[in-house]
Every structure is written in C-alpha cells, then in structure tokens.
Amino acid sequence: MELKMHNVQETENLKFDAEVGKVLNIVIHSLYTNKDIFLRELISNASDACDKLRYESQLNPNLLDLSDELKITISSNKDKNELYITDNGIGMNRQDLIDNLGTIASSGTQKFLDAIKNSKDSSQTVELIGKFGVGFYSSFMVASEVIVESRKAGEEESWIWQSKGDGEYSISKSDNQVPRGTKITLIMHPEENEFLDKFRVENIVTTYSDHINFPVEFIDEEGKSEKLNSKAAIWTKPKNDVTQEEHNDFFRSVAHVGGEPWMILHNKNEGAIEYTNLLYVPSIKPFDLFHPDRRCSVKLYVNKVFITEDNVQIIPQYLRFLKGIVDSPDLPLNISRETLQNNRVVEQIRKSLTKRAISELGKKAKENLEEYTKFWTNFGAVLKEGLCEAMPTDEREALLSICRFHSTGDEKLVSIDDYISRMKPEQEHIYYLTGNSLDSVKNSPQLEGFVSKGLEVLLFVDPVDDFWTSVIHEYKDQKIKSVTRADVDLEKFSSEEDKTDEENKSNEEKTEETILQYFTTVLGDSVKSVKISKKLTDSPVCLAVDEGAMDLRMERFLREQKQLNYRTPKVLEINTKHPLIKSIMKSYAESGENPTLEDMIHLLFYQACIVEGEEMDDVSLFAKRLNNLLGKISV
C-alpha cells in the first residue's frame, strides 16, 4: 500500500515537546552506535502494538476477529528509495500520535504498562519491550523523512504523522482506506539503500527479532511473501516441555560448537527480579576459550528481542564457557538498549546465575565423577580463574569445592574436601605442589618426604594455579601450604624407628652446622641460605622459598612475561643422608676446603635449579665445573 500524500485533509503542523530537537540530534548521531538498530526498534514497536491489541481484545472481543493473524510485514521500493514496516496491531489515533511520537521518552508502551499495572484485572499480562520512548527516532539515522499512517482498532478515522527529524512534525487526517494498524514509510538517505535489500533485512531480523511472538514477513516487489523469523523461543516453554532435540538444535545455534550440551541450565526466576536463563555447558572445548578477548557467549534478550552479546556482564568471566541466553523484562538497559548499565539489578542476576551454575556443577560432580572429569578436563582451568577474583569467602569456598585436582593419594581427580577427609590427625596443612606437567610434579624431589610418610599432596599443573594459590591460603579453616616452603616440617610425622637418640642427634647437628656454613660460603650470593632438608629422602638437594616469599613457579612466570626483571635468591635444602652429601661432609671433615668439593657443591646447586626450571647465570661455568669433575673420574 503506497501512501498518497495528496489524499489528506488539512495538515496540522506541530513542534516536538520541549528540547526535543536537541534530544533528536543525540538520538540520531550519538545514542545508537549500530544503524541496524533502527529496524530492530521498529519491529519491536510493531510487536508491542500487536501485543496491545491481543490484550485489549480480551476485554473487547470486537476489536479482533478470530481469523485475524497478527503479523509484521516489511517491504521496499528501490526506485523510490523507500522502506515500509507495517503491522496490524492496535494502531494509533491523533492523540496517540502526539503523545507517543511527539514526545521523546514518553513512550506509549510505558504508559500502557502503567495502565496494566494499575488495572484491577491483575491476571492479564502482556509482553512489551518499548519502554524507553526513543527507539522510533533511530529511524532518522537512515531516513531523511519518516511518515506514519495509522488507524486505531475500533475507530474509523486514520491519521498521518510526518517529520524530517528537524524539530517539527505534522499530523493530518487521511482519506485513504487504511486497515487497522500502522504503516511506517522511511524515505532513506541515498547512502543507506542497503537496507532496502531483502537479504540485508533478513539478516537484521534473524539477528535481533528471530524469537518475537509474531511472524515477520518480507514482501518482494512481485508481491511474494516470505517469513523471516523462524526460531521458537524455547526458553519460554516449561523446562519439562522442551525436548532434547530442541535443546540440541538451539544449543548449536547459540554455541557454534559441535556435539550436544554436557549440561543444561533452564530456569525461570520470578522473585523481585524476573528473568529466564537457558544456558548450556558444551561437551567440546571451544577453540577460542583462551582468546585474549575472552568474550562471554551469553546473549541478552528483553522479552524475546535480542539486545546484545557484547559487554554483557551477566555472567563472570570464569563461567565464559556457558553458552545461551538470558531474557528479562527487568534488565536495566541504557536508553539506547545497546549497553548494559552497571547497577544493582545486573549484579543480582549475575550473582543468582553464578550461584546456580556452581550448585549444579557441584551436583554433577557428586553424581558421576567420570562425567565430571570430562567437564573438568575441558573447563577446569577457566573455572579456577574465578579463584583469583575478589569475592566473599563463602562464594570462593563454594567455587573451590567444585574444583578437582590430581593427587599423590589417588589416581582419580579429587576434591579439596576429599583431601581434608584423609588428612592425618596431626596434619595442620593442605599441601600442594605446582608444576608444568603431571609427570614433572610426580617426579619432583619436593614430594619425597611426603610420600615416604604417607602424606597426600595435591598436584597443580595449570598456569592459573600459580595465581590463585598466591591469594587463597585457607579453606574451611585449613591452611593451604606449598611443599616448596622452606619451613615445611615433617619430623612430627616420623615413626619411632626414624628417631635418633639424643647423643647421635647432637653429634649430627654439629657436623651439619659445619657443612651448612661451608655450602653457604661456597655459594655466596647465589642462595639466600642453606638449610638441612626435612622433606628430601632420595635426592641430594632442592630449592625452596621462605614463608611469605613468591612461589618458585610464579616468579618464573612473571619473569617470562617481563613483569619481573630480577631473580630472588632461593633457599637451598640439602639431604644430609644422601651419599653425595655424606661424601662431601666426610671429605671436608678430613681435608677441609678444596676446588673439587667446591665444584661438587656448585653442580648440586645447578642441579636443583635445573629440576625447578630455574635459569643458570653462567652456563659456560656450569660446563667447566662439570668437565673438571668428569676429568677426575677413571673409566
């Protein structure tokens, strides 16, 4: 239907409400960053109009014939450079046009919602999204002139609203035989003619309006109609009515990964804040999980109209493996619906979703460890990123409780609660060791004393472990301690046969003190100190750090990332029961200082550095000392 402007009655020229000219300029040039939004907004308004009519017809059945199909149609005329958006919803009369289009931020939809809220018939509900009163004016981003022709349901007269977005508009009565509803004609800027193309329109509709309640059709120049929105908003169904096949199809459309969802979170919250979430945990790890951008993949909808998936802080970064949607009429959007405001409502939804996700993952872990291990292999490292974030103790402990770790005490992954349940009565700490791989930590000299005394140690092999262990030092009143700490004391776990009588012990201490001084003198500034190890059983030496100092692996990581430009001296622990150390002690006691002993001591220090992945200051000197010793060996 073309609009014939000559077929109108007397035109009434009006000015927009106070300061609207300035506001229009903001809307057109600053408020929206994506021009596609204009069509989303017009379709949303059309959907609102259809919703209004459906509601009003329940009170007045004469407004809507049962055979009527409420829908939205889009068409274009490339010769005239015009785009048309038509709906057969409630329509507007003269006063509606003035109130709703002549006043910015005084949306008819909001007024309608207020009327519903104040209605005594509280059982009736309606889904309306145009709460901001400015979406219509985004049309002027792409159009030089906007013409609205409308007839309100139940009324005979039709009206034409017309404006060029310059602070004025006109209203006139139309003599055209206008069907119920509203038709918007956009006279496009020449450079915006891409929006006249059917495929461009279809892309916008499927992106933003694929799930609205009413069909959106495109009518081509030959009069052929094609429905553009096709997907049902399955999250609006009761969760028990959604089939696995529907879940699989929707999951693939939002997750862009293969396979089926490993876990489904489908919930409707009807408390102080209303929202529905349909979130999936993939069974396959996405390729971009650790991309520097680390984008979340949860789409935000308001009453089934897509708003954005960018800058959505509706889930924390450490749950970014979740794919799906959150839909809420209560989500606080800025006036352009493009950027979420950081306020209390968003934070409450975020907290609720986070708590629910952690709770459901915890249930999965208890139900089937084998299945949970698959999840943990894919996403455990991401989940542990959350342990580095600032959060209340109870939330952090809830997150830590669903983490799983390798351990010296079990071939299967264990929880930290499993570990605590197996602690020895006299044990005061949860012990752990970090490393680059499971094999490397299992073979670490740091574990020898713990294994020999039956003490379980948790094995951390993800890079993120270095970070969270630097900020979390306690879990459920149990201290968490690295086995690389120099103050680790395992003597209280010794058996009776391991204890030495006081006389022998006194003699050993004198000998040990002498050798410690010699090691310290030889190594000089290369070490912070030299101590007798209380944890080594098979290896001669190892590196350690004092309590409160940076962990070995964390310091190395920061140096690699150029965040630290120096190396702190470490503690060297020596095992006085090892044959090599005994040989040095004996030789020193018999003949005192000599170059061969010094080479041996330096090589033992180099060995400890190599095992921990520490760089040597002078590789050439290491090779020289090694060659000196090898040259004295008789073959």
Swiss-Prot record:
Region (B): 338-556
Region named A: 1-337
Domain of life of the source: Bacteria
UniProt subcellular location: Cytoplasm
Family affiliation: Belongs to the heat shock protein 90 family.
Function recorded in the entry: Molecular chaperone. Has ATPase activity.
HAMAP family, A to Z: HSP90
Name of protein: Chaperone protein HtpG
Gene: htpG
